Amino acid sequence: MFQGNQAINMDAKGRMAIPAMHRDALASACGGRIVMTAHTEDRCILIYPEPEWQEILPKIEALPTFNKAALRAQRLLLGYACAMELDSNGRVLVPPTLRNYANLDKKLMLVGMGKKFELWSEESWWASVADLDVDEELPAEMLSLSL
């Protein structure tokens, strides 16, 4: 559903405007209701349409709490989760706790990741892209894909 990346700005009040190319899809998929939370591996924010979040929430809650990595993931995903709604201009407030977690300032990158978005500081996004290891071995799940 969501793909591509787009440079966007955050205003002084901590709001960002969802690009028009995604606004209609969000309106029809969830009435503009989204959930923002911390990414478990990178200093960026995950943005889910609310119905998509409701599908993965039971899976997050079912993670074993005696497993340190699973508990860390729960703390990040559930502890930072914020239900938000786009305003009539397609803007949404990025909560201060998440802005701090992802080191967000005015310049942002919104990255479509299929059923969700990632929101990065522009600087962190380009550093992450530059750090990609093209020689890294593909996961086994991708070896059968024909692109």
From Swiss-Prot:
Keywords annotated in UniProt: Cytoplasm, DNA-binding, Repeat, Transcription, Transcription regulation
GO molecular function (one): DNA-binding transcription factor activity
Localization of this protein: Cytoplasm, Nucleoid
Signal sequence residues: none
GO biological process: negative regulation of DNA-templated transcription initiation
Pfam assignment, any one: MraZ
Domain SpoVT-AbrB: 5-52, 81-124
Listed Gene3D superfamilies: Transcriptional regulator MraZ domain
InterPro entries linked: MraZ, MraZ_C, MraZ_dom, MraZ_N, MraZ_sf, SpoVT-AbrB_dom, SpoVT-AbrB_sf
Source superkingdom: Bacteria
GO cellular component, one term: nucleoid
Family stated for the protein in its record: Belongs to the MraZ family.
HAMAP family: MraZ
Subunit structure: Forms oligomers.
Protein name per its UniProtKB record: Transcriptional regulator MraZ
Lineage: Bacteria, Pseudomonadati, Pseudomonadota, Gammaproteobacteria, Cellvibrionales
